[in-house]
Amino acid sequence: MSKVSFKITLTSDPRLPYKVLSVPESTPFTAVLKFAAEEFKVPAATSAIITNDGIGINPAQTAGNVFLKHGSELRIIPRDRVGSC
């Protein structure tokens, strides 16, 4: 089984820390979101993953589909920051 890698950046931190995650392409993207949120110590239930262009990603698909549609560079935003200036 092949793997896909994502570089996920935490946009709510001014230092823009990132993590690189490699997961099997059949992994549910909800699991990727949950793991990334835990790594950044933000609540997974109130976080969203978006593309660098600001397009939200529906987590109800596999990691392989997300990789094919959106590429490897993604951002995680805690939802308390969504829409704030």
From Swiss-Prot:
InterPro entries per the UniProt record, alphabetical: Ubiquitin-like_domsf, UFM1
Modification after translation: UFM1 precursor is cleaved by UFSP1, promoting its maturation: processing of the C-terminal Ser-Cys dipeptide is required to expose its C-terminal conserved Gly residue.
Gene3D superfamilies hit by this protein: Phosphatidylinositol 3-kinase Catalytic Subunit, Chain A, domain 1
Inducing stimuli: Up-regulated by thapsigargin.
Main subcellular location: nucleus
Cross-link named Glycyl lysine isopeptide (Gly-Lys) (interchain with K-? in acceptor proteins), sites: 83
Residue ranges listed under propeptide: 84-85
Effect annotated for changing residue 48 to F/Q: Abolished ability to be activated by UBA5
Family: Belongs to the UFM1 family.
Function per UniProt: Ubiquitin-like modifier which can be covalently attached via an isopeptide bond to lysine residues of substrate proteins as a monomer or a lysine-linked polymer. The so-called ufmylation, requires the UFM1-activating E1 enzyme UBA5, the UFM1-conjugating E2 enzyme UFC1, and the UFM1-ligase E3 enzyme UFL1. Ufmylation is involved in various processes, such as ribosome recycling, response to DNA damage, transcription or reticulophagy (also called ER-phagy) induced in response to endoplasmic reticulum stress.
Protein name, entry field: Ubiquitin-fold modifier 1
Native species: Homo sapiens
Gene it is expressed from: UFM1
